[in-house]
Amino acid sequence: PCSGKSTIAEILSERYGLQYFKVDNHLEEYTIRGAADNLPICKKQIEWNAEQIWMRDPVLQCKDEIIFYEEIFDYIWEDLNKVNQKGAVVTEGAAYFPHIMKKLHVPEEQYAAITPTKDFQISHYKEREWVPYILEGCSDKEKAFQNWMGRDSLFADTVCKECMELNYLSIVNDGGNSINEMVQIVSAHFGWKV
């Protein structure tokens, strides 16, 4: 969900000379690969239209979104390891769920989750010029948007809860901190000179 992750990762990449791997740039490819590998949620995302995706209950959407990231994570990990061979990497994306990071034994000081409050997300998504294209084909675009934001709010809540349970840093962005302040928080957490 929209929380400033990409902007923060870009700044960290430039500031510390790290490669930047943005999962969102590869989601279409991973979805196609997953569908070809008969992964159920990936197949759904390829086959379903906007109405079928966005007019569903947000709870079901959130559940599917979590499963989707679990389905494609092997592809992400494979690509991330290729990039990592070329030097240190900063990476970001909603796919980096705390339970997946724990399973991979990612140390607490090498992971931070940044999620938005629902109000922050809605206010920023309403400014995104591509949102109408995502909802194109929905019979009730306002309801579809509400469902989407509901899904992402549940998703963010799940990430925060998992972070607490697994002792990972969770930063909730309500817009109260500037991007530079958030960059400093993340840098300090990673033990990087601020």
Functional labels for PLM-detected ranges:
Residues 14-63:
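Conserved substrate/cofactor phosphate-moiety recognition/catalytic segment
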Residues 2-3:
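ATP-binding Walker
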Residues 154-194:
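NTP-dependent small-molecule kinase module
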Residues 46-60, 128-145:
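A solvent-exposed, charged loop/short amphipathic helix patch at secondary-structure junctions
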Residues 65-86:
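Phosphate-binding/switch loop-helix module in NTP-utilizing enzymes
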Residues 6:
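Walker A/P-loop
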Residues 80-84, 91-137:
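ATP-dependent NMP and nucleoside kinases share a basic, alpha-helical "lid"
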